[in-house]
From Swiss-Prot:
Organism per entry: Thermococcus litoralis (strain ATCC 51850 / DSM 5473 / JCM 8560 / NS-C)
Protein's name in the database: Trehalose synthase
Function, as annotated: Synthesizes trehalose from ADP-glucose and glucose. Has a much lower activity toward UDP-glucose and GDP-glucose. The reaction is reversible, the equilibrium strongly favors trehalose synthesis.
Listed cofactors: Mg(2+)
Catalytic reactions on record: an NDP-alpha-D-glucose + D-glucose = alpha,alpha-trehalose + a ribonucleoside 5'-diphosphate + H(+)
A Gene Ontology biological process term: glucose metabolic process
Tagged with keyword RNA-binding: no
Gene3D superfamilies named among the record's database cross-references: Glycogen Phosphorylase B
EC number(s) from the headed UniProt entry: 2.4.1.245
Gene name per UniProt: treT
Length: 412
């Protein structure tokens, strides 16, 4: 286990958000933090780069420190075999019923967690927060002396029960369980320990801050994207759950009506996702020689600022995930006043108000129809984008997230 000491949001101050959230909201957060001054708090997850959890922590940890909490962040380490096992957990918990949990998988999963527990004494902190299934068994290997919280960032609405029953024996030892939405809460857990808390974006991070028109245009030019032609974009990891093939199918049908349309597939290759590389290659094969589809990743120099530029340059954002714990890429696009066409699953349903801040769709044909409509009705797209930003501002930005954490810690 190692500690993350460099943060994307280094030097973040609550005061920086006054203009965005207003005086009253800011002072309320300060008041809630008063009781927690000098308390120590530790986050533990499985990667410091790639995916929504790491991105949130890069900004949330510095903000927690700014309000007086001694917040730290540790990342568990493991072999490729371990991360293959945890990827199976992820897929099974999100609904893959064909996967089987073997004794070897259980053994490796517990061994690596035990090894990580030997690296650092988590009982030295006043509060411990464990993110997702990868490090969930850590609680087994300590004599718990303080509140332990487990946070689930994935869509648990229809899990493979073999995996869930095995995981549950660790989860139920925690003092609180955080889920993004009610529909992810498992009935066999103690309901009194359940906390519903959606994640958030940071409006001042490089991914979401305002960019000049000239920077956006330069970024498009650097990656050979034509700003004069319509742009459809999906930002997502290369993962079967993200519906990337469906996005390509939507684009191809839209292109029959609007031949000049371009598609940007923007994604991060994350360190804890060995399966992602296989799916990435499959995606390239499906695309073939269509040069109006750009595959843009951290491997080709795409980082937070570039993603920001691509989202701001897009006419329509797609999110065709088959399962989606929350969908922070939807949140990001809505913050940038973009209409999102998203499959009506998981956290996407929580964010998009159908017909007002974007469109919720059930399948590829529905997505084709709504994407064409938005490309052909710019005024509607613009109005939806404005509504979308308001919705995010009220519900899903990092200061609201921080406040919800303060409420939780104050409840112990």
């Amino acid at each position: 286990m190692y500690e993350v000491t460099k943060f994307g949001g280094e030097g973040k101050r609550l005061e920086d958000y006054r203009e965005i959230i207003g005086d009253e909201a800011l002072e309320a957060i300060k008041a809630k933090a008063e009781n927690l001054k000098d308390k120590s708090f530790v986050h533990v997850n499985s990667t410091s780069f790639g995916g929504g959890v790491a991105e949130i922590l890069h900004n949330l940890v510095p903000l927690m420190r700014d309000v007086g909490i001694d917040a730290r962040w540790f990342v568990i380490e493991g072999t490729n075999e371990f991360f293959n096992v945890t990827k199976s957990f992820h897929n099974a918990l999100q609904g893959n019923k064909e996967l089987r949990l073997t004794e070897e998988m259980k053994k490796l999963y517990l061994e690596i967690n035990k090894k990580n527990a030997e690296d650092i004494d988590l009982t030295q902190f006043d509060y411990v927060l464990i993110h997702d299934p990868q490090p969930a068994p850590l609680i087994e290997f300590y004599e718990k002396r303080q509140p332990w919280i487990w946070r689930c960032h994935i869509d648990l609405s229809d899990p493979n029960l073999e995996f869930w029953k095995f995981l549950r024996q660790f989860v139920e030892k925690y003092d609180r369980y955080i889920f993004h939405m009610e529909e992810y809460v498992q009935e066999d857990l103690n309901q009194e320990k359940v906390v519903i808390m959606p994640p958030s974006i940071d409006p001042l991070s490089e991914k979401n801050m305002e960019l000049s028109e000239s920077e956006i245009l330069k970024t498009l030019e650097r990656f050979d994207v034509d700003p004069e032609r319509p742009i459809i974009t999906q930002v997502a990891r290369f993962d079967p759950w993200k519906g990337v093939f469906d996005v390509i199918d939507v684009y191809r049908k839209v292109k029959e009506k609007i031949p000049e349309v371009q598609l940007l597939l923007v994604g991060v290759m994350a360190h804890d996702d060995p399966e992602g590389w296989i799916y990435f290659e499959k995606t390239l094969r499906k695309i073939g020689e269509d040069y109006d589809i750009k595959v843009l990743t951290n491997l080709t120099g795409v980082h937070a600022r570039e993603v920001n530029a691509f989202q701001r340059a897009s006419d329509v954002i797609l999110q065709m995930s088959i399962r989606e714990g929350f969908g922070l890429t939807v949140t990001e696009a809505m913050w940038k006043e973009k209409p999102v066409v998203g499959r009506a699953v998981g956290g996407i349903k929580l964010q998009i108000v159908d017909g007002k801040t974007g469109f919720l769709v059930k399948d590829v044909n529905d997505a084709i129809e709504k994407t064409l409509y938005l490309l052909e009705h710019k005024d509607v797209a613009q109005e939806m984008g404005k509504n979308a930003k308001e919705r995010i501002k009220e519900n899903f930005i990092i200061t609201k997230h921080l406040e919800r954490y303060l409420d939780l810690l104050n409840s112990f």
